[in-house]
Design a protein with these regions (language model features):
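Thiamine diphosphate
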Residues: 1-136, 164, 231-233, 259, 398-532, 542-543, ...
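Short acidic, glycine/serine/threonine-rich loops at helix termini
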Residues: 35-38, 61-63, 84-88, 110-117, ...
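Flexible, low-complexity linker and terminal segments
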Residues: 1-9, 19, 133, 137-363, ...
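Conserved thiamine diphosphate
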Residues: 107-156, 162, 189-194, 200, ...
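A glycine-rich helix N-cap at a beta->alpha junction
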Residues: 44-52, 94-105, 182-190, 452-465, ...
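Short beta-alpha connecting loops at secondary-structure transitions
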Residues: 46-47, 105-109, 126-131, 284, ...
């Protein structure tokens, strides 16, 4: 063993590698992305690593490998599990031969997600065991144990770190490479009575699942990561039940105090019933400190009824704990003070509060998406139109002054929502904006639906040749894989033509006049058509010469600021200035300026 300073996601990856991982697949999404990327960096060639087209593809690939006896891991964020739930629900009934861990990173807050959904609920829904780590060291150790449980009980298991565990750092003890487990898959053994899902088999396996989970309920009551921290005062009649990062916050707040007993739940499903009952006995009240849903709270309420225990369970359901958002040491301290009758902690305030302006997220300076949105906005000026957005950097197109995203639901939804709006408002020109990675992940089926059902819509693909928002991962259109292989690019143009979209035009959005003309030419044609705005992500290319303002020509109309919202254009002493450190020389502002006062940029 040796010590390393690791991010939580890196620790999870290193733990999986140490457990004999053979295959890892996934789709990038904060806060899970670094798990797969770290695995790839520490791959000696014995692990197959793949960024899949979407989470469903990743799940099915990993399942196939697990059927062969391989140890596999699938990585995604919590909303990715919605995409992967179809194969997962059936896989729960079929089972696996090799250990299979489905890593789903939850995002309390949410910090970078559409929802605050709780994967612990999905565990109970799918009847799959779930592991909920409370810190970086535990995440490293627990992922190895998760593989062992999965393999022993022939079932996929869910592994559910949250954002603060994923992105937290700690010095932890890790195995030396010589101590890594080496797993040699047996290979696929044909057995249609096991691997082919039919109603009769599902019925039989459902019974086996229930029996297995009853067994695991007992096993997890003795699992070392589920534990009771005894009260400092044996006569204390109050207790705390918690989990995950909230357990770490709780122990930090209680440090040095006369603390009540604490129940730590590391496996929310199957719930460690016997351990929980042992904890509840003799207590008058228990406060449940949880993020997201009241999973532990509801389990304890159920157990009090089942075993006729008089303990009062408090938490989210009793409005003693906030119903939404993430916890913190401060929020936990406040909740504990109210529950235990301690003096409320004074709010820490700096002597001189910093006067910081609000800084909402914006598209980067030089981002081609800004030009794409602006081109469509210019072309549709005065026309009745709806702009359906999607998940990615380009969701920021909803911000002023662009104001070009009217809807955003989930990945790929904009393509289909556009069709629905068009059916109700046939006189409205409907656009669906989608990124190149999202196109491959979840928009193609929607486009097939549009062609088949004769929709009237315009698909706008914002193609910057990368999965930008999550850290520039490759996708099928980039011609590169996560293993570093150079492969044939999957052409968006050819794909659209192949499914029957007859009008597909490609244009560089930074050539503004051409882009506006393209939109006017394409958008008003009947039927399904597509515009591909193709220009590389500004973060990945070398910046050109920054723009310059010729003050003798500048009339201070501020059109460049009012219409574009580029962070590279600022007001200084009442005058428009170019922020040289940010400007990439994209030239968009030069093309917007009515007096040609901006020059020096590469596209101007």
């Amino acid at each position: 063993m040796h010590t390393e300073f690791l991010m939580g996601n890196a620790a999870i990856a290193m733990g999986a590698v140490a457990a004999g991982l053979n295959v890892v697949s996934g789709y990038p999404g904060t806060p899970s992305t670094e798990v797969l990327e770290t695995t790839a960096r520490h791959n000696d060639g014995s692990i197959y690593v793949e960024w899949s087209a979407n989470e469903k593809a990743a799940m099915e690939l990993a399942a196939g490998a697990a059927y062969c006896g391989a140890r596999t891991m699938v990585t995604m964020k919590q909303v990715g599990l919605n995409v992967a739930s179809d194969p997962l629900m059936s896989l729960a009934y079929i089972g696996v031969k090799g250990g299979m861990v489905v890593l789903v990173a939850d995002d309390p807050g949410p910090i970078s997600s559409q929802t605050e959904q709780d994967t612990r609920r999905f565990a109970a829904f799918s009847k799959l065991p779930c592991f909920d780590p409370s810190g970086v060291q535990e995440a490293y150790d627990m992922i190895q144990e998760a593989f062992a449980y999965s393999e022993k009980y022939h079932t996929p298991v869910l592994f559910r770190p949250t954002t603060r565990v994923c992105h937290g750092y700690a010095s932890i003890q890790v195995k030396d490479k010589a101590d890594y487990l080496v797993n040699q898959p047996e290979g696929f053994v044909k057995d249609s009575s096991k691997w082919v899902i039919f109603p009769r088999l599902s019925y039989q396996n459902h019974i086996r699942m229930e029996e297995r989970n009853e067994q695991l309920q007992e096993v997890f009551s003795g699992y070392e990561r589920n534990c009771i921290r005894p009260a400092a005062d044996p006569g204390c009649k109050k207790g705390i039940a918690t989990h995950g990062i909230s357990y770490a916050y709780t122990m930090e707040v209680l440090h040095g105090k006369s603390a009540p007993g604490v129940l730590k739940v590391a496996t929310p499903f199957p719930f460690p019933e016997q351990l929980a009952v042992e904890f509840l006995q003799g207590l008058d009240e228990v406060l449940c400190l949880e993020e997201l849903d009241p999973v532990i709270e509801q389990e304890l309420v159920y157990l009090c009824g089942k075993y006729h225990l008089p303990t009062k369970i408090r938490g989210k359901l009793t409005h003693d704990v906030a119903p939404a958002g993430e916890n913190s040491c401060d929020s936990v301290a406040k909740d504990l003070a109210a529950f235990l009758g301690w003096e409320q902690p004074a709010a820490a305030a700096p002597e001189t509060p910093p006067q910081l302006p609000v800084r909402p997220p914006v598209l980067c300076a030089g981002c081609p998406h800004r030009a794409s949105f602006f081109a469509v906005k210019e072309a549709m000026k005065g026309k009745k139109s709806v702009f359906c957005g999607d998940i990615g950097c380009y969701t920021l197109g909803n911000a002023m002054p662009l104001d070009m995203v009217d809807t955003c639901l989930c990945m790929g939804a904009g393509v289909n929502m556009t069709q629905g709006i068009g059916k109700i408002e046939p006189d409205t020109t409907c656009f669906a904006f989608v990124g190149d990675s999202t196109f491959f992940a979840s928009a193609i089926t929607g486009m097939v639906n549009a062609v088949y059902n004769q929709a009237n819509m315009t698909l706008v693909v914002l193609d910057n040749s990368t999965t930008a928002m999550t850290g520039h991962q490759p996708h099928p259109g980039t011609g590169k894989t996560m293993m570093g292989q150079v492969v044939d690019k999957v052409s968006i143009v050819d794909t659209l033509h192949g499914i029957g979209v007859k009008t597909v035009e490609t244009v560089d959005p930074l050539h503004l006049k051409e882009a506006v003309a393209c939109v006017k030419r394409v958008a008003f044609q009947p039927g399904v058509k597509a515009i591909i705005f193709k220009s590389p992500c500004a973060v990945l290319i070398k910046s050109g010469k920054p723009a310059e303002i010729e003050e003798s020509k500048c009339i201070q109309c501020k059109k460049c600021i009012r219409t574009l919202g580029c962070p590279g254009i600022i007001l200084q002493d009442g005058k428009v200035r170019i922020e040289q450190a940010l400007c990439t020389g994209c030239g968009l502002c030069a093309q917007v300026c009515p007096t040609q006062a901006i020059g020096g940029a590469c596209h101007a």
